């Protein structure tokens, strides 16, 4: 499976390199191992639909002696902001194995996916857990303060349960666009959690 090295933070004297690989280049064993690790890291609060959302884009992996210890993914979505459908890199499945937490591995996989965001998208977005909010704020991600919605088959529908969890990272907005994080934003439709 082809990997691209992206970042190599040193934590506790150990060098961990985040590697990028597209979903299409993952063999079945690696993909299934990543799914299991992410589900375990989320302590069961991560569904098959959540994993499905993480497929089809780039994955950042950190392995130690062949075992996956950290993961993040970025997939393409469209977010409607005012009259523009922004090309969005949506970050999914950011997870660090429990016995490796607190060593900067989440930072390393985020460095990798943010490199992808800056190279390919107009906007980064993610739905943050309460425990991860501080990390995203420290990296320059902006909490979305306006109303969220989804463009579902029946039309635009508000998603008030997601209003507090959305974060965005402007990386290449169209010329002249100012991002107002108090405005409404709408995501494209998908099964499971839409945000």
From Swiss-Prot:
Top enzyme class: transferase
Leader peptide range in chain numbering: none
PROSITE patterns: GNAT
Residue sites binding CoA per the record: 94-96, 101-106
UniProt EC number: 2.3.1.-
Location of the N-acetyltransferase domain: 21-180
Record-linked InterPro entries: Acyl_CoA_acyltransferase, GNAT_dom
Subunit structure: Homodimer.
Protein name: Aminoglycoside 2'-N-acetyltransferase
Organism: Mycolicibacterium fortuitum
